[in-house]
Amino acid sequence: YALVCNGGVLLIDGKEDLEWYEESKKIIKESSNELLKAIDILNKDERRRLEVWFIKELFVFTKCDYPEEVVYELESRINTELVDIFNSGVKVYIVPKKLSKGNAVERFRKYIKARKVIVAGDSELDISMFGIADVAIAPRKLDTKCQLPIKTIVLPERKVYSEEVLE
């Protein structure tokens, strides 16, 4: 199994589970107008450095100069009760609140009837799933940025994070 697109798409043996995807679209339906509004705003923004991507009609992504300013402007024009707007470096994301990684992990736990869930994440985008999991794995850099749940295994940064997790 692999959850991609912020948990909106489930791959089983490399193939997309269409029922999972359709359910994801239903879950975020109330956010659709805000996503479309963000696309319109970003398409007109001169700070944008990449076309605006509407990834699987689930969330919006682009790259911008001065991304913090872009996020601030979007937050003033879009309903932030329905969507999260943030940047990671020059990347700008608009993601329905209901399409969090934490919600995806909870859906997946029920889907496979898992008794125990272990997650690994390396950015602030991953924090919502840490509280859902029985065990979470994160790099030290994330532990210094925000408060992680007590059950989080914090890895030293000696190697590439994915290699540390697999060991």
Listing of model-derived features with the role each one plays in the protein:
Residues 80-99:
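Glycine/Thr-rich beta-alpha phosphate-binding loop at enzyme active sites
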Residues 63-70:
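Helix N-cap motif at beta-to-alpha junctions
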Residues 95, 102-167:
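Mg2+-dependent phosphoryl-transfer enzymes with acidic/Ser/Thr/Gly-rich catalytic loops
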Residues 3, 101-102:
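Conserved mixed alpha/beta catalytic, RNA-binding, or beta-rich assembly cores of soluble enzyme
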Residues 1-47:
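Active-site phosphate-binding/coordination module
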Residues 38, 42, 70-81:
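Short amphipathic alpha-helices in soluble, non-transmembrane regions
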Residues 49-55, 84-87:
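Short beta-strand
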Residues 57-63, 92-94:
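Short cationic amphipathic helices and targeting signals
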